[in-house]
Amino acid sequence: NGGGNYTEKNMTLAIDGSLKRLQTDYIDLYQLHWPERNTNYFGKRNYNHDIKEKKWNDYESVLKALKKFVDQGKIRYVGVSNETPWGLSKFLEISQALKLPRIVSVQNPYNLLNRAYDIGMSEISCRENVGLLAYSPLAIGYLSGKYRNNQIPKKSRIGMFGDFWTRYKEDNAKKAVDDYYNLAKENGLTLTQMSLSFVNSRPFMTSNIIGATTMEQLKEDIGSVEVELSDEIIEKINLIHANNP
């Protein structure tokens, strides 16, 4: 967790600690939370290569350590999070060559305002059968509509913790939210329902990681699984996205 040292010793401490806290014998899916190398994750749009950076090439040792945990029965499957096409490809390449545990999932952000996953990761997901566990499907609440017209509810995440997700405050993002809101309303849907249903419809999607602070929000989120977007709505969503990248 936290892009820390993925040594066998550190991962052993982390896994044993998790097993103890969870009071369970094994973990179904164990994911590496952050890439240990320098890369463009968590809101960074571009990769800035640092020639002075110490080269990180411990894929083999990390996978070998994970294999020990699988063999010991502590974990069953392994995944990554906040990964890039290059990083995921390296893990897959080395695991196949050395017959080590294969990455089965990647937990990255994905929503109507952040479709970076579509560019390179989606093809790898589909062709290599690595499912996306999409986090922030409502863009930290922007796609619920509660921040429209510069409103900031006191008990919202931004109201309590401030807003450092600058990409969602840009003018084109605000316009996109308004356009998505109107499209949902025209089709008898809430913005939340349409946003989550779109995420659910993607061919590379394995799990849509929703978040809710009230029972009403939870019911609306869960209800999105009953919503099936028409081809026409999908086409209009893609048009809004093209006009507000």
Annotate each language-model stretch with its function.
Residues 7-21, 63, 88-93:
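Short, acidic/polar
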Residues 1-10, 50-57:
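Active-site mouth loops of central-metabolism enzymes
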Residues 3, 19, 113:
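Glycine-/small-residue-rich active-site loops that bind phosphorylated ligands and cofactors
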Residues 35-239, 244:
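Beta/alpha (TIM)-barrel catalytic core signal, keyed to glycine-rich beta->alpha loops juxtaposed to Asp/Glu
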Residues 11-28, 120-129, 233:
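Short amphipathic alpha-helices and their capping/turn segments at secondary-structure boundaries
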